């Protein structure tokens, strides 16, 4: 008699990490050019045009969404922006 061994099926699930937004807040200290340069150095995926738009939105509306990404990356970008003396926060998107 032959014995057949069966292995239990293992269900693999991939969980999608919830998105977080990095928010840049306006300030009256840093120049517009400085903010654009800080954005470009802090968030590598941004281009010059995007950085300008984000800076102008933060300047006119008080805040602007820089990017949306997983939490760990959002924390990194926030910390980088803050290292340039900018005010940035993260919030769940």
Give a label for each model feature:
Residues 1-93:
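Terminal domain-initiation and capping elements
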């Amino acid at each position: 008699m032959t014995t057949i061994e069966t292995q239990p099926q293992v269900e693999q699930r991939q969980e999608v990490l919830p998105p977080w937004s990095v928010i840049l807040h306006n300030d009256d200290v840093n120049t517009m050019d400085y903010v654009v340069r800080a954005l470009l150095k802090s968030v590598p995926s941004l281009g010059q045009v995007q950085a300008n738009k984000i800076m102008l939105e933060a300047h006119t509306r008080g805040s602007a969404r820089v990017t949306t990404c997983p939490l760990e990356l959002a924390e990194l970008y926030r910390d980088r922006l803050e290292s340039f003396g900018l005010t940035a926060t993260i919030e769940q998107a």
